[in-house]
């Protein structure tokens, strides 16, 4: 776990992110307010501020690999890894990776889903930061954490753009150190 003192100042990134997230009502189903990050992605300066904040976090944690969770986590993990000079590991939906994989099921609102990672994705002891767009219920993050630990990784944390606090996802991430740029 990291101390509060070692965390980068995320206030600038939070302000930029807040100005570049659009609420989409009733998507993907009635009653849901979807947080759309495409305005952030389409504004290079704003995207750069947010990626820079995530890269600063990764550096501070000593991450040598960045793991991105399908699909929007890929959009963040790749530029963060590039800025840090780290490798990138994709954590994908079931059936999307060739070769030998590890699998982890997690609960959805109705049913289950499965995430996969290559068996040889990270060497034992590799310092990995998981990156995703949103922490909601915590199921996806917990599954990603389990997969990486199963490969022998030293998972240094989870970094997300937004944390939907009303869903209590942080409670399901166990010992995983979570950093969110913005809490909703």
Curated annotation (Swiss-Prot):
It is an enzyme of class 2 (transferase). It catalyses: AMP + diphosphate = 5-phospho-alpha-D-ribose 1-diphosphate + adenine. SUPFAM superfamilies: PRTase-like. HAMAP family: Aden_phosphoribosyltr. Homodimer. Catalyzes a salvage reaction resulting in the formation of AMP, that is energically less costly than de novo synthesis. This is Adenine phosphoribosyltransferase. It comes from Parafrankia sp. (strain EAN1pec). The gene is apt.
């Amino acid at each position: 776990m990291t101390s509060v003192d070692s965390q980068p100042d995320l206030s600038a990134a939070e302000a930029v992110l807040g100005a570049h997230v659009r609420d989409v009502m009733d998507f993907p189903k009635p009653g849901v307010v979807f947080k759309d990050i495409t305005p952030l992605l389409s504004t290079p300066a704003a995207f750069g501020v947010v990626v820079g904040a995530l890269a600063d976090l990764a550096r501070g944690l000593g991450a040598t690999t960045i793991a991105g969770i399908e699909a929007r986590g890929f959009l963040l993990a790749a530029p963060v890894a590039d800025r840090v000079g780290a490798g990138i590991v994709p954590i994908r939906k079931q059936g999307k990776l060739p070769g030998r994989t590890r699998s982890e099921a997690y609960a959805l609102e109705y049913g289950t889903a499965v995430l996969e990672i290559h068996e040889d994705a990270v060497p034992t002891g590799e310092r990995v930061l998981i990156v995703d767009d949103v922490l909601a219920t915590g199921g996806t993050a917990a599954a990603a954490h389990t997969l990486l630990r199963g490969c022998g990784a030293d998972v240094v944390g989870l970094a997300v753009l937004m944390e939907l606090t009303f869903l209590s996802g942080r409670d399901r991430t166990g010992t995983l150190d979570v950093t969110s740029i913005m809490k909703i």
